[in-house]
Amino acid sequence: MALLLGLILLILLLLVRQLGTRLSAQRALRQEILSLKHSQAAEASGIVRFIEQELTAPQPRSGEACYLVLDTEAMELIDEVEAETSFVSPLFALGWQLLDASGQCLREESYMLLQTGERSEALRQLQQVSERCYRAEAIAPSEALQRLSEVLQPQLTLVGHHLAYHLRQLQSEAEQQRIPLPLIAQLPQRCLMQEGLRMGFKRGYDDSPRYPSAEELFRYLHHLGSEPPLPPLRKALRDLRLSASSLRVLLSWERSSD
C-alpha cells in the first residue's frame, strides 16, 4: 500500500513539474511575442518618423548650390503614354530645391500657378489641393518663372524624376509667358526615373524592367517596403521632396564608392 502511494505521489510530482515547465515555456513564448511586437512597433514608428522627416519642409541654410531638383504639375491629368509624347499642358505647380554637393537642401520654393482652366475632380484629389485653396494661394505663372530664372546658375546639375517631361512642360509655359530660360537647357541633367530603370527593381509581367514612380524609387533606395503609407501632402511638394531624398542616397553611394 505504501509503495502504491509513493508511486502515485511520484507520478503527481512529475505531472506538476511537467505542468510548471509547460507554463514557463508559455510565459517565455508570450514574452518573446510581446517583445517582438514592441520591436516591430518601435521599428515602424522609426520608419514613420524617418519618412515624415524626409517629407518635412527643409530649413534654409547657406552653402554652395550644386544641384537643382525640379518638379512640375500639370492642369490636366496626364497618363504614362502622354508623358512620353510631346503633349503639354498649362502648369498647375512649379517647385524646386537647391542642394549642395552632398544633397542637403539649401533652399526650397514651390508655387501653384494661377491658370484659367479647370482641373478635374480626379486631378484635385491626386494633387491634394482644393479649388478654393488653389485660387487663394496661386500666383501668376510669370512670377514663378521669374523666380526660377533668378536661381539658375551655370554650375548646377538639373535633376528631376521624369526630367524630360518636366522640362517640356516648363519650357512650354515659359514660351507662353514669354520668359526665356535659355540656361536651363544648357545645364547637365540627371533623370532619376532613368536611373531607377537601370537598377531593375521594378519588373513588368514579362520580367522586363519598368520605370518606377518617384515614391517607388524613394522606398527602394531607403529599403522601406510598401508600408507605411506616405503622410498627406500636396503632390507637387511630395514628389519634389521624394526626388531630393532619392538623390541624397545616390550621392552617398557615389561618395562611398570613390
Regions found by a protein language model. Give the residues of each.
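N-terminal signal-anchor transmembrane alpha helix of single-pass membrane proteins
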Residues: A2-S24
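Juxtamembrane transmembrane-helix termini
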Residues: T21-R27, L251, R255
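Entry/capping segment at the start of metal-dependent catalytic domains
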Residues: R27-S102
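Charge-rich, solvent-exposed alpha-helical interaction surfaces
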Residues: E32, F50, E54, A122-Q125, ...
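Metal-dependent phosphoesterase core characteristic of DEDDh/y 3'-5' exonuclease domains
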Residues: A65, F87-L94, L98-Q127, L152-S257
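Short His-Asn-centered micro-motif
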Residues: L70, E137-A138, G160-H162
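Metal-dependent phosphoesterase signature
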Residues: L126-L145
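Glycine/serine-rich loop-strand microenvironments at binding/catalytic pocket rims
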Residues: A140-L156
